[in-house]
Every structure is written in structure tokens, then in C-alpha cells.
């Protein structure tokens, strides 16, 4: 692990390590996307390189996760070869008391949902700032859309009461493009009272590939906290 005194970084490292410790030999694991999950991938790789873990292969949820896995020596496979995973580790942008999630800050939520839903156990790694009473409180809901359907999808989302914004790139001109070659519309809903119903309703809009609501998928939440200046990990099951 990188040596640092930053308490937030230390917290992310501790949560990533706690998740990585739940990986056992002879397993297939889903490798999520995000800054906290990156530490889990790093630590899994270190355990593989030291021989502590054997016969472990990962399924990446994004090109970024694939790059990290290769960097740290985690062997990879694809869904063309396997049909389920023993464990998936991924982050989230919001978590409600029912363990429902909003994901997609990294525009990888479509592949994340596919991989996470195929795991026997799905572990979510977050910091305490991601815990909310209701989804949509602090984070916009990402919706992946095929390019030709952006305008009609925006109109449909606004009819549902959402305020929409086409996600633009940072350090690049133009909109964000997903690994699937699609665009992302970020939507603000004042209240998401029924996440399961909204997830289905949005996905039924023609042109929508997937949205960032993950309902009834997470099994365990590992929450990083700073207590008395030191990182701690709390479990929500």
C-alpha cells in the first residue's frame, strides 16, 4: 500500500483491505470500479503475488478495473467463460438503510450491475459520507443512453419529474462516453420514494440501456469511518 498520512486515503485503504480479506483461494471475483475498490484490487493482487491466494480470477466491471487488475497481477476472465461469481466487490455513490444503492459516478454502472448481480455475495465498499436516508439525496442518478435516443430519453425522464443533465467529460472535450460507446444522462429526483419501481420505469424507456439504481443486490456494506483520527471499518448486513 502507498504510505500516506491522509485520514481519508487511510480509510479507503482499510475498507479496501477489509473487502480483499474476504477473498479466498479457488474463487471467481467481480472487480468493481472506483477509488475505494481500487485499493481492494491492489490488495488482492498483493495477496496473489505472495502466494497467500491461489487460483483466483477476476471479472472487471470497466476498462479501468481491467487496467488495475493487470497492473497488480490479478488474472482475468470474462462472462463468455463463466456464468457466475463467488464474490463481487464494488463501490457506491449512495447507500440507503435497505442497502439499496446509486452507482455510476464512474459511468460503469451497466457493467457493474451485470457483474454484481451474478455474484453469490456482493460486498459494497464506501465511506460513511455515502450513507443516506433516501437515495437521490446527495447524488444524481446516472442513466446510460444510446446516442441517438438522448433527446427523447431526456424528455421522458423529465416527465417522471427528473431534472436532467448530459454528463460532460473532464479534461476532454464533449460528453462522457461509456465503455459501451453510449452517453450518460445524470438525473436529479427530489425524492426517490420507491427505488425498485423507478429502476424498472426508467429501464423501460426506449433508448435506455441501464440506470444506476441497484435495488436488492447488495449483501454486505463495509463502511469506512474516521474515529478519533483513525480509520475504522463498520459492517452493515
From Swiss-Prot:
It is an enzyme of class 5 (isomerase). Keywords: Isomerase. InterPro entries: NagB/RpiA_transferase-like, Ribose5P_isomerase_typA_subgr, Ribose5P_isomerase_type_A. It catalyses: aldehydo-D-ribose 5-phosphate = D-ribulose 5-phosphate. Signal peptide: none annotated. Pathway: Carbohydrate degradation; pentose phosphate pathway; D-ribose 5-phosphate from D-ribulose 5-phosphate (non-oxidative stage): step 1/1. One of its GO terms (molecular function) is ribose-5-phosphate isomerase activity. The active site is at 112 (proton acceptor). GO terms for cellular component: cytosol. The keyword Mitochondrion does not apply. The keyword Isomerase applies. GO terms for biological process: D-ribose metabolic process; pentose-phosphate shunt, non-oxidative branch. Substrate binds at residues 33-36, 90-93, 103-106, 130. Its EC number is 5.3.1.6. Catalyzes the reversible conversion of ribose-5-phosphate to ribulose 5-phosphate. Belongs to the ribose 5-phosphate isomerase family. Homodimer. This is Ribose-5-phosphate isomerase A. The lineage of its organism: Bacteria, Bacillati, Cyanobacteriota, Cyanophyceae, Oscillatoriophycideae.
Amino acid at each position: 500500500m502507498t504510505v500516506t498520512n491522509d485520514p481519508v486515503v487511510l480509510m479507503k485503504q482499510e475498507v479496501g483491505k477489509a473487502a480483499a480479506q474476504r477473498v479466498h483461494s479457488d474463487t471467481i471475483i467481480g472487480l468493481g470500479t472506483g477509488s475505494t475498490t481500487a485499493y481492494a484490487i491492489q490488495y488482492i493482487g498483493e495477496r496473489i503475488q505472495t502466494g497467500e491466494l491461489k487460483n483466483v480470477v477476476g471479472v472487471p466491471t470497466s476498462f479501468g478495473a481491467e487496467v488495475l487488475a493487470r497492473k497488480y497481477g490479478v488474472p482475468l476472465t470474462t462472462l463468455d467463460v463463466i456464468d457466475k461469481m463467488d464474490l463481487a466487490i464494488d463501490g457506491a455513490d449512495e447507500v440507503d438503510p435497505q442497502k439499496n444503492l446509486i452507482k455510476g459516478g464512474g459511468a460503469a454502472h451497466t457493467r457493474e450491475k451485470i457483474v454484481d448481480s451474478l455474484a453469490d455475495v456482493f460486498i459494497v465498499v464506501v465511506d460513511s459520507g455515502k450513507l443516506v436516508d433516501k437515495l437521490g439525496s446527495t447524488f444524481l442518478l446516472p442513466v446510460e443512453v444510446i446516442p441517438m435516443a438522448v433527446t427523447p430519453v431526456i424528455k421522458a425522464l423529465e416527465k417522471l419529474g427528473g431534472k436532467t443533465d448530459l454528463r460532460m467529460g473532464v479534461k476532454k472535450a464533449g460528453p462522457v462516453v461509456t465503455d459501451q460507446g453510449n452517453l450518460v444522462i445524470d438525473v436529479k429526483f427530489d425524492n426517490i420514494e420507491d427505488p425498485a419501481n423507478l429502476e424498472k420505469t426508467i429501464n423501460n424507456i426506449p433508448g435506455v440501456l441501464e440506470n444506476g439504481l441497484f435495488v436488492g443486490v447488495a449483501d454486505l456494506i463495509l463502511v469506512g469511518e474516521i474515529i478519533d483520527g483513525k480509520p475504522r471499518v463498520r459492517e452493515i448486513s
